[in-house]
Regions:
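Short, amphipathic alpha-helical interaction segments positioned at domain boundaries
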Residues: 116-156
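Short amphipathic alpha-helical interface segments
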Residues: 52-72, 76-79
Length: 157
């Protein structure tokens, strides 16, 4: 039986094909699934340069604005780009701050936005808030690498 992070149920064996971006996400999944065994399949963490990451995320924002009624699913963003939900919450708040969009509704699962347009991504790249977000991105990548390289018995405690 295959399930996604939307519908985690108890199971005997849990297999990760995409690694969680942070310990919090891993712990939530383990708590809900309560597996007897955990397998981490071979995985290459998504590591993008800043411009590529923002370009991809911006494309996701535009898609949501034009095709999803402005609804941005945070779990979907996190899963697709391999970063924590908090990264995307902070990015959307920053995009609003620089005038790219207006957030009309928000909760832990999704944001609904009114897209204004993106004229210059350097407004984001040169922001001190983006530097903090980038540090979070680096932490996500380091956590995913730790799942590949470290003793999993220690990580899973």
């Amino acid at each position: 039986r295959v399930c996604s992070r939307y519908e985690i149920t108890k199971c005997d064996v849990l297999m990760f094909f995409d690694y969680p971006a942070d310990k919090k996400t891993l712990d939530i999944i383990l708590e809900k699934a309560q597996p007897k065994k955990v397998h981490f399949m071979s995985y290459e963490p998504k590591v993008m340069d800043e411009a590529e990451f923002l370009k991809t995320f911006t494309g996701m924002v535009k898609f949501a604005a034009h095709n999803m009624g402005g609804k941005i699913d945070l779990v979907r963003c996190a899963g697709f780009l391999g970063k924590s939900i908090e990264v995307f919450q902070r990015l959307l708040d920053l995009y609003e701050e620089v005038g790219f969009l207006t957030v009309t509704d928000r909760n832990n699962a999704f944001y609904i936005i009114d897209f204004k347009g993106i004229d210059d991504l350097s407004k984001v790249l040169h922001s001190t808030k983006y530097a903090e977000i980038f540090d979070m991105i680096v932490e996500c990548e380091a956590f995913q690498r730790s799942l590949l390289e470290d003793d999993l018995a220690e990580v899973l405690l």
